[in-house]
Amino acid sequence: MPKEKYEPPDPRRMYTIMSSEEAANGKKSHWAELEISGKVRSLSSSLWSLTHLTALHLSDNSLSCIPSDIAKLHNLVYLDLSHNQIQSLPAELGNMVSLRELHLNYNQLRVLPFELGKLFQLQTLSLKGNPLTQDILNLCLEPDGTRRLLNYLLDNLSVSTEQPPPRSWIMLQEPDRTRPTALFSVMCYNVLCDKYATRQLYGYCPSWALNWDYRKKAIIQEILSCNADIISLQEVETEQYYSFFLVELKERGYNGFFSPKSRARTMSEQERKHVDGCAIFFKTEKFTLVQKHTVEFNQLAMANSEGSEAMLNRVMTKDNIGVAVLLELRKELIEMSSGKPHLGTEKQLILVANAHMHWDPEYSDVKLVQTMMFLSEVKNIIDKASRSLKSSVLGECGTIPLVLCADLNSLPDSGVVEYLSTGGVETNHKDFKELRYNESLTNFSCNGKNGMTNGRITHGFKLKSAYENGLMPYTNYTFDFKGIIDYIFYSKPQLNTLAILGPLDHHWLVENNISGCPHPLIPSDHFSLFAQLELLLPFLPQVNGIHLPGRR
């Protein structure tokens, strides 16, 4: 950060005075810079209404203080307050996070507010000729002095923000009381791997709040507070899975399965510890593990390239993975849901899948192909399990239900989400970027090889998102990007969503000027998803032509 190239104002400022004739003819003035000079002692309050300004030149005046209202000029990228008599700066100056240059030379500043450390996009901070303390001046003289000083200020800024209010629990529908059901809850959470939590990416967060030892406490607290029956995590570091997450969650009755990204297989044991991957945990009192699977997208791309250069050069080079566990519901879960003894003899299985797709917005084609690969493999897993375990597990719906959790790195209007939620996508969808994938994509049709119909690749699931209709305005919240990229999908008609955990209070974020996460009070750049699902169970055999749903 910052990612956009900054063009400083032209020092040769040109002034054009509009003639009365131009004004009479309706000519509009467009100006984004303002200079005020002439030994001005105070500033008019009307100045703070000029929120369109990007540069403000206030040097060579007689200003002794700057009002806190200056923070209303939120579009400023350049502010020059040099050669004044300013003795102190308002803390609110730290909220002007668009600033790239701040010139404070030759004033009477003895201290700087720690809030200045929040100006993470600042490239130049000029402080010559001020009676500042020696440690501040020494920091300024070091290589990359501005960055070092800002880091020092931010790391020493006390956190006065109160904890966010609890996220609301949103009921969507009542459980089906007319038939046997099993209720269980699912969490999906990208925990932000330590190696990605850098000041370069998250310059607005103090270094101590990016530290994994600090963040992991809040992460595990959030996970445990939800008390989900199934937990799907992305960006879990290999070493942290075994030494932290598995240890903490096993103590609370969970078992888990984890796979690192494909690059781990070529690394030394020491390097492998820091590779992130996907994990699924489940409560052993409610589920029994039947099978576990890892899906490596680069291996699938290599095996199914069919001569496609895009498949080899774009998809195969990305090492994202997915994992899946086939779980059997324990009798106790069914009895807890129904409040009655479970008298059925059939096994009830469910497949839980978790994936993390490639991140780069320029690779929408890769995300879409990875999603197709994953769903194809999930379908294969379900089909094989159904055949090997025979009809005793299928019930009246004819297939094993699916819960799919993922950081898809794709917005709701993307080809990825269209593919999942509508059952298919056109082979000429814009997200393929007109690259040649057609021959290889037929291999991933969930309707079997050559399963394309009318130029559309389809899959055999009926998937629905637990968070529909804008229930969450964003699941990823950084300074540069705010949007929905995390999802919980489930298969219909066997599964329904009864309730979900709502979004973090938007007013809390705005009122506390939180421009991005992580934050000292929010440990990841993602917000967790949490849903209560209802699984419709097969009716017990008929007695005199009447179904007995769990003998209720």
UniProtKB/Swiss-Prot annotation:
Enzyme Commission numbers on file: 3.1.13.4
The enzyme's main class, written as a single word, is hydrolase
Q: What GO cellular component entries does it have?
A: CCR4-NOT complex; cytoplasm; nucleus
Q: Where does substrate bind?
A: 235, 271, 356, 361, 409, 476, 481
Q: Which free-text remark accompanies the cofactor? A: Binds 2 magnesium ions, but the ions interact each with only 1 or 2 residues.
GO process annotations (BP): miRNA-mediated gene silencing by mRNA destabilization; nuclear-transcribed mRNA catabolic process, no-go decay; nuclear-transcribed mRNA poly(A) tail shortening; regulation of translation
Q: Name the Gene3D superfamilies on file.
A: Endonuclease/exonuclease/phosphatase (3.60.10.10), Ribonuclease Inhibitor (3.80.10.10)
Provide the catalytic activity annotation.
Exonucleolytic cleavage of poly(A) to 5'-AMP
User: Which Pfam family would be a valid example here?
Assistant: LRR_8
Cofactor dependency: Mg(2+)
UniProt binding sites for Mg(2+) 1: 235
Active-site residue list:
407 (proton donor/acceptor)
Annotated localization: Cytoplasm; Nucleus
Q: Which GO terms describe its molecular function?
A: 3'-5'-RNA exonuclease activity; metal ion binding; poly(A)-specific ribonuclease activity; RNA binding; RNA exonuclease activity; transcription coactivator activity
Q: What does this protein do?
A: Poly(A) nuclease involved in mRNA decay. Has 3'-5' RNase activity. The CCR4-NOT complex functions as a general transcription regulation complex. Enhances ligand-dependent transcriptional activity of nuclear hormone receptors.
Q: Describe the family membership recorded for this protein in Swiss-Prot or TrEMBL.
A: Belongs to the CCR4/nocturin family.
Q: What is this protein called?
A: CCR4-NOT transcription complex subunit 6
* Organism expressing this protein natively: Xenopus laevis
Q: Which gene produces this protein?
A: cnot6
